[in-house]
Regions:
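Short strand-turn-strand beta-turns centered on an Asx-Gly dipeptide
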Residues: 101-105
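Surface-exposed beta-strand/loop patches in extracellular or lumenal glycoproteins
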Residues: 79-96
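Short, isolated positions in well-ordered beta-strands
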Residues: 17, 23, 39, 57, ...
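Hydrophobic residues positioned within well-ordered beta-strands of beta-sheet architectures
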Residues: 76-78, 100, 130
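Surface beta-strand/loop "capping" patches
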Residues: 48-83
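C-terminal beta-strand-rich structural cap/linker in extracellular carbohydrate-active enzymes
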Residues: 27-50, 58-60, 86-90, 112-130
Length: 130
C-alpha cells in the first residue's frame, strides 16, 4: 500500500482510502463526496483525521495511510500503514462491544463508551500494512 497522494480517494470496491503520513506540513481536503456522504480529511506526519458529514470517524497519532476503509452494519474494516506504531481512534456506535482484529488475528473484544470511540494501538513500524 502506498500513501494516498490525493489525500482521499474512492476505490473500485466501494471503499475509500485516505491519509498521507509522509507529509511534513498539514494538508486537508473538504467536501469529498462518496456514496451520498461528505468527507473531510486532515493528514500529515503527526496526525490523520477523517470526518463524515461533520462527525468524527477516524483519527491516528502519528499520521497513517488507510486503505479500503469500509463501514458496514457490523462495524468497519480497513488496512493501515504508518512509519511508526500508532494509536487509532475509531468512531462507532455508543456503548457497544466490538471484536477487534489486527493483522487478521483477534485482539479481543473492546467496548465503546457513550461517545462511541474505540481506541486501538497498532504496531506499524517496519510492518507494512496491517
Amino acid at each position: 500500500m502506498a500513501v494516498v497522494k490525493e489525500l482521499i480517494r474512492e476505490e473500485s470496491d466501494g471503499s475509500i482510502s485516505f491519509g498521507n503520513y509522509t507529509l511534513a506540513q498539514k494538508a486537508k481536503l473538504e467536501d469529498f463526496e462518496h456514496a451520498g456522504d461528505l468527507y473531510k480529511v486532515k493528514t500529515f506526519s503527526t496526525m490523520t483525521k477523517l470526518e463524515k458529514n461533520g462527525l468524527f470517524l477516524y483519527e491516528s497519532v502519528p499520521g497513517t495511510s488507510v486503505s479500503h476503509f469500509q463501514e458496514t452494519a457490523d462495524g468497519v474494516s480497513f488496512e493501515v500503514e504508518g512509519a511508526d506504531d500508532a494509536q487509532l481512534i475509531i468512531g462507532l456506535c455508543d456503548d457497544t462491544q466490538y471484536e477487534v482484529f489486527v493483522a487478521g488475528k483477534s485482539a479481543g473484544k473492546m467496548n465503546t463508551g457513550l461517545g462511541g470511540k474505540l481506541n486501538v494501538s497498532v504496531e506499524l513500524a517496519g510492518m507494512g500494512e496491517v
